[in-house]
Structure formats: structure tokens, C-alpha cells
A protein has these predicted regions:
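Low-complexity or membrane-interfacial segments used for flexible interactions
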Residues: 1-77, 82-90, 96-101, 106-200
């Protein structure tokens, strides 16, 4: 069992770099500032890395791994991936064994970021909605009950953490029942960042 996946509040801090071919994020304990996980994009080959600096980066496939670093371990517990796309993104989330947990399907023709959250069978089980700035997101179930939030600011975090628009706090509500749904919520800010900010 991964302690990282059982957390209800996680701070996400992007690695900042002017010329970077792969995105990376630290996952921190909000109370202590300790790094408890790492999110790393895997970009293979010189050609693919060079394509990341062109207009084609908005269409390219991506594969991202969530590493649990708690207790001295380094275990891949989640993956987030998308194939090459022309228009609407469909992002697949799987656990460390490759079992599909669900998918995020981008909603087209929307001013603010919006994505349907699907179970492995393709049923709509939740909805991810962002504000027009793309900084704050609400994760709701099919009945519009809030299951969690992804926010740019949180009262429990020091201001020194917020040095980039791509730093977030994930807050999972007790109402978010089911391990798979909690893991999809954990993947939500990285998915939104890749689709709407890094790749939009």
C-alpha cells in the first residue's frame, strides 16, 4: 500500500526550467515541506525532445510517472499518458501495475478548462472544472457533489511556496470514496497542466 496515495492533502511544485524537454513536479507534505513524491515525464529519443520545442508539442503523446518516495522507497504508483492527438485530449490514468483506473476526456469549445472523468468502462463518474485562469479546479461527482479541489492558494501553505503559476495544492474531501477515484483526483492537476498549460 502506498502512503502517498492515502494522503488527503498534497502540495504540487513544478520544476522550473526555461529550456526543458521533460516536465517534472515535486509532491510535498504541506505541513512539513518534505518531498514525499516525484512526478516525472518520460521523453525518449533526441527527435522527440527536439519536437517539444516546436508547435507540434501541443499534439504530442506524453507519459508521466508518479513516484512514491516516502520511507526511502522509489516506487511508481501511477502513470498518466496520452496518445498523439489532433483536437480533443483523452488522458489515461493507470496504477503502478498498468491497471487502468480511468480517463480524463477534454471538453471542447469551453472558455475554462473542463474534463469529464471516466471509469475504465467509459462511464462518466466525475467532472473536473477549472476557472478561466486555469489555476483552480473543482472535482465533482455525477451528482455535482464536491469530491476535492485543486487550488493555487491555501491558508496552510507559506507564501514562499507559491513562486509559479504551476504550483498547486490537492485537497481530497472525505466524500471522495473509492481508491480509484482518489487516485484520479491526485492525477488531476498534472493532467490539466499538461493539456491546458504546457500543451495548450
Amino acid at each position: 500500500m502506498s502512503a502517498l496515495l492515502d494522503r488527503s492533502t498534497i502540495f504540487v511544485r513544478e520544476h522550473v526550467g526555461m529550456f526543458k524537454a521533460a516536465n517534472a513536479y515535486d509532491l510535498l507534505d504541506p505541513a512539513t515541506g518534505a518531498v514525499v513524491g516525484l512526478v516525472q515525464e518520460r521523453v525518449g529519443g533526441f527527435f522527440r525532445k527536439m519536437m517539444k520545442f516546436t508547435q507540434w508539442k501541443t499534439r504530442m503523446s506524453f507519459h508521466i510517472e508518479f513516484h512514491d518516495l516516502e520511507g526511502g522507497r522509489d516506487e511508481v504508483v501511477l502513470t498518466v499518458s496520452r496518445p498523439f492527438t489532433w483536437f480533443r485530449s483523452v488522458v489515461t490514468v493507470a496504477d503502478g501495475t498498468g491497471r487502468v483506473l480511468g480517463r480524463f476526456r477534454q471538453k471542447l469549445l469551453s472558455i475554462s478548462p473542463k474534463m469529464w472523468v471516466l471509469d475504465p468502462a467509459g462511464n462518466e463518474v466525475a467532472f473536473l472544472k477549472g476557472d478561466w485562469k486555469g489555476w483552480n479546479f473543482t472535482f465533482t461527482d455525477a451528482a455535482a457533489h464536491v469530491l476535492g479541489t485543486v487550488t493555487k492558494k491555501w491558508a496552510g501553505i507559506g507564501k514562499e511556496f507559491f513562486t509559479s503559476a504551476d504550483n498547486y495544492v490537492i485537497d481530497i474531501s472525505p466524500a471522495c470514496q473509492g481508491a480509484d477515484l482518489r487516485r484520479l483526483l491526485l492525477a488531476a492537476p498534472i493532467t490539466a497542466d499538461m493539456v491546458y498549460k504546457e500543451y495548450a
